[in-house]
Amino acid sequence: MPIELFNNGDHKCVAFTELVQGEGIQANQFLITDGGEGMLLDPGGNLTYKHLLAEMANYFLPSRTRYVFASHQDPDIVASANGWLLITDAKIVIAQEWVRFIPHFCIKGVTEGRMIAIPPKGMDLELGNSRLKLIPAHFLHTVGNFQVYDPLSKILFSGDVGASVMDGHSAGLPVEDFDGHLVESHMDGFHRRYMCNNKACRLWVNMIRQLDVEWIVPQHGGSFKGKAIINRFLDWFETLECGTDLLSEADFRIP
């Protein structure tokens, strides 16, 4: 069931949290539409493709899909690239580091002229009458990692930053108990393992505090809506020890 995060009549942001069925990790897919044009955000792989295709038709036709944005290269992000390139005229928008990896998901030649490489500093992207910001989140958790900030809705689509593990229905609800969420939804453990290090966390938080964000919506699990819980999340993430901060000789022993 689609969840409308924002709708002013012309500009809409929509989340899908229950499309993954089976053994795959729960994942959220998103779309933004403005002026009749559409963009898919982290549309996933074969587990979500046909379901997302059916749902998106309620908001825009495949022929009006201008972009498929991929925050990074993981299969739960963009393994369905081949399908979208075949049935739409959309271009895939992804970090320049991953442009030559996407063809491995596709039949030969289908990506030619269909890729937009995001430079390391990020960029603006026009969609209909709106302008979206693609902002860097490098090493959170991959090199060449980007997020989408929508100034109109004030939503930050944060990819794996803020991600947690839960069922699809629960993922459609904003987090209310932050401290409980840290443990019960495995957010703390996920970030300690998947995020690169505290330096990357601190630099990212410093950048995000410069934006007017009303809602942080990750690609897995629940979201953070409202200034109070967003600040609580930023305070936690800013001091998090993770990734290489936690490595020791014990992690590099011959089995």
Label every model-predicted segment.
Residues G226-P255:
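C-terminal regulatory/interaction regions
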Residues G45-N46, P75, A163, S223:
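Short, glycine/acidic-enriched loop or turn micro-motifs at the edges of active sites
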Residues G9, I87-T88, T111:
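Short, structured coil segments at secondary-structure junctions
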Residues P2-M56, Q147-D150, K154-S158:
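Conserved beta-strand hairpin/beta-sheet module of binuclear metal-dependent hydrolase folds
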Residues L41-P43, R64-Q73, I92-Q96, L156-D160, ...:
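Active-site neighborhood of phospho(di)ester-bond hydrolases with catalytic His/Asp-centered motifs
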Residues I94-P218, G222-K227, F237-L240:
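Metallo-beta-lactamase
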Residues T48-V93:
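Active-site metal-binding motif and surrounding structural segment of the metallo-beta-lactamase
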